[in-house]
Amino acid sequence: MKIILANPRGFCAGVDRAISIVELALEIHGAPIYVRHEVVHNRFVVNGLRDRGAIFVEELSEVPDGAIVIFSAHGVSQAVRQEAKDRNLKVFDATCPLVTKVHMQVARASRKGTKAILIGHKGHPEVEGTMGQYSNEDGGIFLIEKVEDIARLPMQDNDDLTFMTQTTLSLDDTAETIAALKEKYPAIQGPHKNDICYATTNRQEAVRELAKLSDLVLVVGSKNSSNSNRLAELASRMGIKSQLLDDPSDIQDDWFNDVKTIGITAGASAPEELVQSIISRLKEFGADTIEELQGLEENMFFEVPKELRIKEVN
């Protein structure tokens, strides 16, 4: 069997930054460091940080007063920020700057009293944080996941409306939903370019090319990773078998029936270390050739907070 590697794949700048913030906080301040929600959606990464002294919690009520807490890459609501301030928690914010950009769009709509529509997945922490940026009682923010949800929106054609999107959605699905929104609300405003992040976009485009050459596409990523799930779905939509896996132990013999070429990619929160361990396991199943596709070079970099950056330089 032949292995073909997608390019780009794996860590994005926002994930790199978020993990660095936890690592540096542990190095400088020592354990324990509390992290609200999984800092990124990858089991391997989270377990590694937990082993070093990070304590992952879902609510700030689980964090002792005055402790250090890190907000995950997915962002938090204004209510969570206020709670941390009220309790004198020392906060390091690992929210991805591209998520923060969407937060600012929502906050702007809230200040103006403009009704906002967010395209995203209900229950995802990024969506909860983004919805929680809207505080103007005279307007409102509404969540839709798909085209069919538009029919239940309560707004009128002449309302002052704007839309934004979760950063890790399917490009195709989101384009379809935006087109349907604009058809129903011709005057609706939105970002000049949709809010789906560069890494999500690049990895989906890379999977399109990978699927054309593969009999099976393996996506390295955790089941709670939105962008990893979208990669597996995209390959399946193209008629190619796909599997989402956390690590080599997930690999099953029957995946390789009639498979000559295996495509491998990784979600934005999956480290290259996992990809290489899966390649090693595939060699035991008979994979003997490895090819890496050419792809876009990513040079995006996001700084860590100043307090940690100074220590990092020293």
From Swiss-Prot:
Picking any one GO biological process from the record gives: dimethylallyl diphosphate biosynthetic process
**How is the cofactor bound, as the UniProt entry phrases it?**
Binds 1 [4Fe-4S] cluster per subunit.
Q: Does the keyword NADP apply?
A: no
EC number(s) per UniProt? Answer: 1.17.7.4
Which Gene3D superfamilies does its entry note? Answer: 3.40.50.11270, 4-hydroxy-3-methylbut-2-enyl diphosphate reductase, catalytic domain
Name the active site residues: E126 (proton donor)
> According to its UniProt record, which reaction does this protein catalyse?
isopentenyl diphosphate + 2 oxidized [2Fe-2S]-[ferredoxin] + H2O = (2E)-4-hydroxy-3-methylbut-2-enyl diphosphate + 2 reduced [2Fe-2S]-[ferredoxin] + 2 H(+); dimethylallyl diphosphate + 2 oxidized [2Fe-2S]-[ferredoxin] + H2O = (2E)-4-hydroxy-3-methylbut-2-enyl diphosphate + 2 reduced [2Fe-2S]-[ferredoxin] + 2 H(+)
Q: Does the keyword Hydrolase apply?
A: no
Tell me which family the UniProt entry assigns to this protein: Belongs to the IspH family.
Q: What is this protein called?
A: 4-hydroxy-3-methylbut-2-enyl diphosphate reductase
Question: Organism, per UniProt?
Answer: Haemophilus influenzae (strain 86-028NP)
